[in-house]
Amino acid sequence: MDGNATGRFEEEFSDGSRPGRASNHKLRMVLSGLLVLLVTTSVVVRVVRAPTTLSPLAQTGHDKAPVQTSAPHAVGPASANVVREFGGCELSVSAGAPVVPVGSCTVLEIGDSLGNDLGWGLARELPSGSSLNLVQLDKSATGLANAGYYDWPTELETDLGLYHPQLVLICLGGNDEQGMEVDGSAIQFPSPAWTAAYLTRVRQLITEATASGALVMWVGMPVMEDPDYSQGMEILNSLYQQGVRADPNAAFVSTWQLFSNPEGAYQAVADVNGIPENLREPDGIHYSFTGEDVIATYVIDEIAANFHVQLTPTNPAVITDW
């Protein structure tokens, strides 16, 4: 309500007399103005708040707006062995389940900037105009070690409620080689107390997703150029594997051998589909454009193999030689 409207409203009744027809007309005009003001304010609030609700990922660094795309449309009967009712999504962890068309599924992909790399590759490799819907909600510089900066369990709870995915892809860890605060005390990476606390957070994220009815695929960290940093990633990968083993509706996918040369070491260049390509960025951490396609191709193949569905990358990018 503006100050002029308030003044006019009070002036009509300031002498205590009964308002006449002219006063009633003025009163109706004032009230109409107030109604328009209230409606306008309500609309503005909704327009401003909506993006923060629907787009929780960061606006800077490697992050982009959420990507929603699609993959192969296929129609097929639901397998009798499917563990959960997905309403047309045929992903299944049941041993011996027949391989069927993937159906209509929503895949939520979350993680740090390496997760972003994976998500961008998936957005290109999952065919458009079909019924596998990708929702990419990564945030750079995040992980599970610093919940004070970004609380992934809380964010995931919101995302699960918004998108109701049948599969959650998790790819993070690049920022987690650091100390943590637990119950007000600082604990150092990778002490026994640290690994125990971190494993608890890993399991919390997995359980939160599977309790919502989704399956989980945790994509591990790759070999890194810096040997010490790479060793830290191996420690984290072992914790992701432990977390996944505790839940029958979750799977772990290792990328270590995929991006290691025959000697098991970091190498930035390899032949992809017979052509020499850079797989990694100059920082020795992130994936290049081609590397994004390589990991996306690999993850799509792993989704098909682990969850018994027919799923083929649009333009498969495969390492053919080192």
Language-model features, listed with the residues they occupy:
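Soluble non-cytosolic domains of exported or imported proteins
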Residues: 101, 112-117, 146-151, 188-200, ...
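Conserved SGNH/GDSL esterase-like catalytic core that processes O-acyl groups on lipids
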Residues: 88, 96-193, 321
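Catalytic His-Asp segment of secreted/periplasmic serine-dependent ester chemistry enzymes
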Residues: 223-322
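N-terminal secretory targeting modules
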Residues: 1-108, 306-322
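Active-site segments of SGNH/GDSL-like serine hydrolases
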Residues: 171-177, 181, 205-237, 256-257
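Solvent-exposed, polar/charged alpha-helical surfaces in well-ordered, non-transmembrane soluble domains
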Residues: 116, 120, 124-127, 154, ...
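Charged, glycine-enriched surface loops/patches
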Residues: 186-215, 219, 247-250
